Amino acid sequence: MTTDQPKLEPIDPRTAQQLYLDHKRTECTESTVRNHKYHTNYLVEWCEENGVDNLNELTGRDLQEIRLWRKEVGDINLLTLNNHMSTLRVFLKWAGSIEAVPENLYDKVMVPRVAPEDEQADETLDGDRAQEILEYLSTFEYALVEHVLFGILWEAGLRIGAVRALDVDDVAFEEERLELVHRPDQGTTLKNGPGGERLVVVFR
C-alpha cells in the first residue's frame, strides 16, 4: 500500500531556521522575527547538543525531550514555556511544508495550557516581560481582543475600566491618540467621572 507522504529533503537545523526566519520577514514585523529567532534558537541548540544534524530525523519523542529540556535549562514559568512551544509548533508546521519534517510532526508538539491564575502575579510587570507578551500576542493572537487590550493597557498605562469605556470614535488614528470620555448614560464610566476625561497618546 502506497502513501502520499512527500519524500523528505535533508536539511540541517540552522539552515532550516534561517530559511524560516527569511520566510517570516515577508509577513511579520522585525520584532516578531526576533522573537521567533529567540525561540527557535533553543531547538537548534538542542539538535547540536544531541547530534541531530538533519531535521528529517526529528521524532515525537524528541519533541517531548525538547519540551522537558527547555523547562529545565531555563527554569522558566508555564507562560514562557507555552510561548516557546507554540513557536516551535509554528516552525515545524512550516518545516513540513518544505519537506524538512513529516507534515504532521507539528501536531505532536505538546503546548502546555495556561490557566488564568497562572497569568496573574502580584509583582510589577517589567518592560522585557511586557515586550515578550506583546510579541506573543502579535504572533498568535494578532488583532484579537486580548492583543488590543494588552497593547493599550501597556502603552497608555490605563485602567481596564478606562479601556472598556472607549468607543470606536474615541480612537484618532491620524492624531495617534485616544480620548477618554465619561458616559454614565451609556454604561461606560470613568473612575473619576468627568475629571478622568483626557487625551492619551498611545501609538508609536
Question: What are these language model-derived features?
Answer:
Residues 32, 80-83, 148, 197-201:
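Amphipathic alpha-helical recognition patches that constitute DNA-binding helices
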Residues 165-204:
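Conserved tyrosine-mediated DNA breakage-rejoining catalytic core shared by Y-recombinases
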Residues 127-160, 164, 184, 195:
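Basic, Lys/Arg- and aromatic-enriched nucleic-acid-binding interface segment
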Residues 10-11, 107, 123, 177-186:
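Short, flexible, mixed-charge acidic loops at enzyme active sites
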Residues 2, 18-120:
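N-terminal core-binding DNA-recognition domain of tyrosine recombinases/integrases
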Residues 61, 128, 166-169:
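Structural detector for helix-capping/boundary residues
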Residues 7-20:
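Short alpha-helical hairpin
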Residues 115-132, 187-203:
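DNA breakage-rejoining catalytic core of tyrosine-based enzymes
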